[in-house]
A protein has these predicted regions:
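Short linear motifs embedded in intrinsically disordered, proline/glycine-rich low-complexity segments
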Residues: 27, 38, 84, 88, ...
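Intrinsically disordered, low-complexity regulatory segments enriched in Ser/Thr/Pro
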Residues: 48-100, 141-163
């Protein structure tokens, strides 16, 4: 079922594109010589909610859980807010509707977000931000466990498996 959802909604390419546009807009809106120190897909896998969180401060990125300067970037930038509302919200509503019938959706949702982070890394989206901490996380999640899951997806990608 998840494969059908991915194919029909183009979930991963959509999220990747929205993330790239959000990162670009955040860089323009909050220019700084400092690189981003932390990036997260901050989400609720139960409901399909997804936010991008950012910080430029390494100490904040290193906290458990990280303390984001910008907890919900797409809500802070009006043009990006509209973009997310127009493009992501219909997919989220479909996810919420289908999730009730498919117990595996929340874990598949998280795994797809991890795949997108790895794809963004591979594309060089985070190259201007050396040492950036990357996460796919939920509120009150164990960030160490979440990072371990991201490492597994990253390793699969490096071994030639589709991330």
């Amino acid at each position: 079922m998840w494969a059908g959802f991915l194919a029909e909604t183009q979930f991963e390419p959509l999220v990747r594109n929205l993330a790239l546009q959000t990162l670009a807009a955040a860089g323009d809106a909050w220019p700084s010589r400092a690189s981003w120190a932390g990036f997260a897909f901050n989400c609720s896998a139960s409901w399909g909610f997804l936010h991008i969180s950012l910080t430029r401060l390494p100490a904040r990125a290193a906290m458990e859980p990280p303390d984001w300067e910008h907890e919900c970037v797409e809500a802070e930038l009006p043009a990006i807010t509209e973009l997310w509302r127009a493009r992501y919200e219909p997919v989220r509503l479909r996810y919420e509707e289908e999730r009730a019938a498919h117990a595996g959706y929340p874990e598949a949702f998280l795994h797809s977000l991890r795949r997108v982070v790895v794809q963004l890394e591979h594309q060089g989206a985070f190259a201007p931000h050396p040492g950036i901490r990357l996460l796919v996380t939920e509120v009150d999640a164990d960030t160490v466990a979440e990072e371990a899951e991201l490492v597994r997806v990253r390793q699969a990608f490096r071994m030639g498996e589709a991330p």
